[in-house]
């Protein structure tokens, strides 16, 4: 329902504000309904594959060893996909209720990024898509935060790059220091994001005009995790050229970090000697 603006005074401004809020509520409600529909579809797809191949193998189908291996690979892949989707939904619930917490420690961010890259190198093997990873080998990238959550950030961003990147194309990942921050850039060379959609891509439930299906909450969760670390998630994109996602988080002094690492190692040695 919209209010009719009659006068250009304070009452008129109030009408404009109420109408804007009403439009936003309607837009969010539509996005939420689309989200529920998308999640239902996204859950059904891996479940169908798992159920179909499980039944085939249990009823004696796939007597050829290669076919059995293929079936088991599909079950494994779809199970992991399903697990990630459920974890994403749980994270969204925690985020909405303000219960998303960090297990803070001092750690080397490069190790978490490298593990995420290594995982996707294996997942993309045979797809024709390649990952190019670059960092300064002499640099150290220590920070205070939740190592598992930061790895989740990188997995989500690389997953998006693989999903929206050009088939058989390239994903570039760069790690560097910028002032007092650590900056990670993940770049694909796919279709890119329309300029009109860029302001909304981090909103919950937002999916844009892409034909790729998804829950519409992955990027909003990623953004929230980065914010909890005192960092910033920035997206730059140009249609027809691709998308670059920048993650900036506060670095800590290398000497401080190494002091913490040494202290932890010393405590572990004392515990072992007791």
Q: Where on the chain are the PLM-derived regions?
A:
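Short conserved segment of the HATPase_c
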Residues: 193-205
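Membrane-proximal coiled-coil signaling linkers
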Residues: 25-66, 70-74
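A conserved beta-strand-to-alpha-helix junction within the catalytic ATP-binding
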Residues: 12, 103-121, 131
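HAMP signal relay modules and closely related sensory coiled-coil linkers
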Residues: 1-20
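Short alpha-helical segment of the dimerization/phosphotransfer core of two-component systems
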Residues: 74-82
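Conserved micro-motifs of the catalytic ATP-binding
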Residues: 97-102, 140-145
């Amino acid at each position: 329902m919209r209010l009719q603006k009659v006068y250009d005074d304070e009452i008129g401004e109030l009408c404009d504000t109420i109408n804007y809020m009403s439009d936003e509520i309607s837009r969010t409600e539509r996005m939420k309904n689309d989200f529920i529909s998308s999640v239902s579809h996204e859950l059904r797809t891996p479940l169908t594959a798992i159920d179909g191949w499980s039944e085939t193998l249990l009823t004696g189908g796939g007597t050829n060893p290669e076919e059995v291996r293929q079936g088991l690979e599909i079950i494994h892949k779809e199970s992991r996909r399903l697990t990630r989707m459920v974890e994403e939904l749980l994270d969204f619930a925690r985020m909405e209720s303000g219960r998303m917490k960090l297990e803070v420690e001092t750690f080397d961010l490069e190790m978490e990024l490298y593990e995420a890259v290594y995982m996707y190198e294996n997942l993309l093997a045979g797809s024709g898509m390649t990952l190019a990873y670059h960092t300064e080998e002499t640099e150290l990238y220590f920070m205070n935060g939740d190592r598992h959550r930061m790895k989740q950030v990188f997995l989500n961003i690389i997953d998006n790059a693989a999903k929206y990147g050009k088939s058989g194309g390239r994903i570039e990942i760069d790690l560097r220091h910028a002032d007092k921050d650590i900056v990670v850039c993940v770049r694909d060379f796919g279709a890119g994001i329309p300029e009109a959609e860029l302001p909304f891509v981090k909103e919950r439930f937002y999916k844009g005009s892409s034909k790729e299906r998804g829950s519409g909450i992955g990027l909003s969760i990623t953004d929230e995790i980065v914010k909890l670390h005192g960092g910033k998630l920035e997206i730059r994109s140009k249609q027809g050229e691709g998308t670059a996602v920048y993650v900036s988080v506060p670095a800590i002094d290398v000497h401080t970090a190494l002091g913490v690492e040494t202290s932890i190692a010393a405590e572990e040695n004392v515990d072992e000697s007791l």
